[in-house]
Regions:
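Beta-strand-enriched cores of mature, soluble protein domains
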Residues: 1-132
Length: 132
């Protein structure tokens, strides 16, 4: 069952590189900030995207969320991206893990569903909901 919205992030693509021209396969890195369960966070994420059919991408990524000076959580994710006139719209899932005892401790073993977009200017936005 889809639960409450957990996060809202905004950021910018900070780097891209071609991993393979057969396919092709692209790696994208994003720096973002926002709110996760009421806590202000900074996020660094990297994902690899490959085309699966005309106008559709398959992406796999990983990231780190930081809150305060030392509170951290890591995640992996997988999503399907579809090209639009404004960029690429992603839908997928994120899987968290952390040994944090701080504000991010409640993310441990949480699965989230995501809606994200990277526009043609490299702006990134994401909303996530807990999947219970």
């Amino acid at each position: 069952m889809l639960g409450e919205q957990i996060a809202e992030l905004k950021g910018k693509v900070i780097g891209q590189r071609v991993l393979d021209v057969e396919g092709p396969t692209m790696e994208t890195s994003v720096s973002a900030s926002g709110n996760v369960k009421g806590t202000q966070v900074n996020v660094s994420l990297t994902y690899v995207a490959r085309p699966t059919s005309a106008g559709v991408l398959h992406g796999e990524g990983q990231g780190v969320i930081m809150a305060g000076e030392s509170d951290m959580a890591a995640y992996t994710g997988e999503a399907v991206g579809r090209f639009s006139s404004s960029g690429v719209k992603w839908r997928g899932a994120i899987f968290y893990r952390t040994s944090s005892g701080g504000e991010l401790a409640s993310l441990n073993n949480v699965v989230e569903l995501l809606e994200a977009e990277v526009d043609t200017e490299g702006n990134f936005s994401e909303k996530t909901w807990e999947w219970k």
